[in-house]
Amino acid sequence: GLKEIFKAGLGSLVKGIAAHVAS
């Protein structure tokens, strides 16, 4: 559903930001 897609996108976004901040 839409919520699952949103959660997946948000999760990858958070991971990307976390990786950017950590490096």
Swiss-Prot record:
It is found in: Secreted; Target cell membrane. GO terms for cellular component: extracellular region; membrane; other organism cell membrane. Keywords: Amidation, Amphibian defense peptide, Antibiotic, Antimicrobial, Immunity, Innate immunity, Membrane, Secreted, Target cell membrane, Target membrane. Expressed by the skin glands. It comes from the Eukaryota. The modification Serine amide is found at residue 23. GO terms for biological process: defense response to bacterium; innate immune response. Antibacterial peptide with amphipathic alpha-helical structure that shows selective growth-inhibitory activity against Gram-negative bacteria but low hemolytic activity against human erythrocytes (LC(50)=145-220 uM). It is moderately active against the Gram-negative bacteria E.coli (MIC=25 uM), K.pneumoniae (MIC=50 uM), P.aeruginosa (MIC=25 uM), A.baumannii (MIC=6 uM), and is weaky active against the Gram-positive S.aureus (MIC=100-250 uM). Belongs to the frog skin active peptide (FSAP) family. Alyteserin-1 subfamily. This is Alyteserin-1c.
